[in-house]
Amino acid sequence: MNTTPIRHSGLQKAVLSLYRSFLRVSNKKEMDNPSSSISNYIKTQFRLKATTIQKRDINKIESLLVKGKRQLEQIQDPEFSGFAVFTPKSK
């Protein structure tokens, strides 16, 4: 049995840290508004990105990290109540 811990790269650690931060903030928000599904949205988005973005596309991952950090700051605002999702019409 292999008991050596998994070693993550710096980028993987940054993504995991951002994910945990999002979940912590969303849990606090959902205590204020139990009908909110912020954590479900966050989990869905992270899983979607994990399946659609190649692990070797470091530039894309880094840009999404920056975008995610900005979004995290926004949801930490006491006035934040949820995400607005816009889906463009297909032609």
Swiss-Prot record:
Keywords recorded for this protein, A-Z: Chaperone, Mitochondrion
Pfam annotation, one family: Complex1_LYR
Function of the molecule: Plays an essential role in the assembly of succinate dehydrogenase (SDH), an enzyme complex (also referred to as respiratory complex II) that is a component of both the tricarboxylic acid (TCA) cycle and the mitochondrial electron transport chain, and which couples the oxidation of succinate to fumarate with the reduction of ubiquinone (coenzyme Q) to ubiquinol. Promotes maturation of the iron-sulfur protein subunit of the SDH catalytic dimer, protecting it from the deleterious effects of oxidants. May act together with SDHAF3.
Organism field: Dictyostelium discoideum (Social amoeba)
Name of this protein: Succinate dehydrogenase assembly factor 1A, mitochondrial
Record family assignment: Belongs to the complex I LYR family. SDHAF1 subfamily.
Gene Ontology cellular component annotations, sorted alphabetically: mitochondrial matrix; mitochondrion
Superkingdom classification of source: Eukaryota
Subcellular localization, as worded in the UniProt entry: Mitochondrion matrix
